Structures are given as structure tokens and as C-alpha cells.
Amino acid sequence: MRLKRLSTNHLLSIADLDREDVETVLRVAERFKERYLAGERVIPILEGKTLGLIFEKPSTRTRVSFEVAMHQLGGQAFTYTKQELQLGRGEAIKDTAAVLSRYLDGVMIRARRHEDIEEFARYSEVPVINGLSDLEHPCQALTDAFTIREKLGRGPHTVAFVGDGNNVCSSLALVCATLGWDFVHAVPEGYECPDRVWREVERRAEESGSETRVVRDPKEAVREADVVYTDVWVSMGDEAEREERLRVFRPYQVNEELMSHAPEHAIVMHCMPIQRGYELTDDVADSERSVIYDQAENRLHVQKAILALLMG
């Protein structure tokens, strides 16, 4: 499989990618999935190469999908928590990045602070991938775009995100604007995406000819939506605000009543883990509209594409 390189050495943010990069990732992921479903479980593009996975936050889908992805590409993945490394005892990020670059061919980091991943990339001689930070979740957003196309075609589409303007929402808004898809965010005042992200979303939307809107009414957001997306109300790191967030976001629950205002063809997405009965009810999560498990599966194929394009 011949692969075209991306225009970036790292994947820290969707803002690192132009439209051609995004299309390349989606196209390569499609080829990987087709071959996987045809029974070709190992494609040794990264044979002999190693990926380090560093986790400051817990993970199920990100950890397992990256470990399996490296195996299916013929390489190896080594997983560490921050506390297992000298980072946990105060070693400078600069020194850790420089040293790990001598051992590994790539590093994926899940960190609390986006700035820590940016600093790591600054001193790394090998590709660095953001596996989730407080600002963005680019691997998830690329997977979401892949899943939307798989279910609904190339588009353009209208994506409604109902809930907190968190890392998942930020990256999804950026990828939608990049692809020329309309994005509507239903959110309580004060919980919108960070200004630095939204400015880039608006710039890309203007460039691609798509529309981005922030509304307060979830029913308005889903009325013309092809995709209704939600995520947890209390993200990792927001636990101290739990009770207040549960109160504020209660009217933003994705349930049967809200979905009755969406078009019949609209699909429901969630990056998982789900706090069932809060942001998403069981009857919707387990309905025919829900694509949550396909979405989770696609992390594997999209991340194989990301790894192959950055490390191949």
C-alpha cells in the first residue's frame, strides 16, 4: 500500500490538518477497514517500528485500539502511565521527549494539559499524537467523520452536538468546518467551546462554505440534523463541578422526546464512555439510530491510518 505523507509531522489538533490531510486519513482508513473485513488482519507497513503510549488519564478505547492497531500494522506498542515514568517524579518534559525519541518511532499521549503535549512535540524527534487532552480529541473527531460518511455518504451533512463544549466537541466542530459540513452546538451559556478553538472553526467554515451556530435550545439544534451527537456532562478533570453540571445540562439530555424533533434518518453518536441516564438514555443509545459501537470500532481503522501516515 503506497501512502501519501501528511502535511504535518504531529497530530496534536485537527487544526494541524488541512482538508486534503483529512481526506487522506479517511481514504486510507477506508482501505484498511476493507482489507480487515476481507480477512487481512495484518498489513506490515510498520514492521519493526515501535509506538509508546503514555497515559495521564484512564482509557479503554484509545489504549486498546492503538495497541491493536500497531499489532495489525506489524509493529509494537508499549504502554505506560505517567507515574511509571520519571515524568511522574518531575522530570522535564523536554528531557523525556528527547530520550524517548531515541527509543521509539512514535509517541501517543493522553494528558490533562494540552500544553504538555505541545511541549512534548516541540522536543520530540518522532511523531507525537494527541490521544486526548483538555482541549482536543483529534483521533476521535477523524473517526467520527469516517463513521458519518460510512453511514450517510460523503455529504455535506449537518451535525448537531448537544451538550458541553469539551475536547470532543471542539475537535468535531473543527473537522466538520474543514469538510464543509454544517455544525450546530446546543449548549448552556458559559459552557461553549474555547474561544481559540471557535475562532478557527469559524475561519475554516468560511473557507469551506459551511455554517456554524451556537444555540441554547436542543430542539432547534436537532431539527435539521443528520447527526445528533452528545458526550458526558462531567469530563475527566471536571469532577469538582459534578453537581452543578448535572443540574445545568439536564435539559440537554438526548432522549426519545428530543429525537422526535430530528429527521427520521438522523443517527445518534457518542464517543463513549456513556453515563447512561444522564446525557443519553438507554432507549436512544440502544436504538436502531445509534451507531455508537460502529463508531468505537472505527477508532481502530482510523488510527491505523494515522499511524501509517505519520510513521510509515
Swiss-Prot record:
GO molecular function: amino acid binding; ornithine carbamoyltransferase activity
Enzyme Commission number(s) from the entry: 2.1.3.3
Keyword line: Amino-acid biosynthesis, Arginine biosynthesis, Cytoplasm, Transferase
Binding of carbamoyl phosphate, residues: S59, T60, R61, T62, Q86, R110, H137, P138, C139, Q140, C271, R299
Primary subcellular site in the record, as a coarse category: cytoplasm
Keyword Methyltransferase assigned: no
Gene3D superfamilies, per the entry: Aspartate/ornithine carbamoyltransferase
SUPFAM superfamilies named in the record: Aspartate/ornithine carbamoyltransferase
Example GO BP: arginine biosynthetic process via ornithine
UniProt: L-ornithine binding residues: N167, D231, S235, M236
One GO cellular component term: cytoplasm
Function: Reversibly catalyzes the transfer of the carbamoyl group from carbamoyl phosphate (CP) to the N(epsilon) atom of ornithine (ORN) to produce L-citrulline.
Protein name, UniProt field: Ornithine carbamoyltransferase
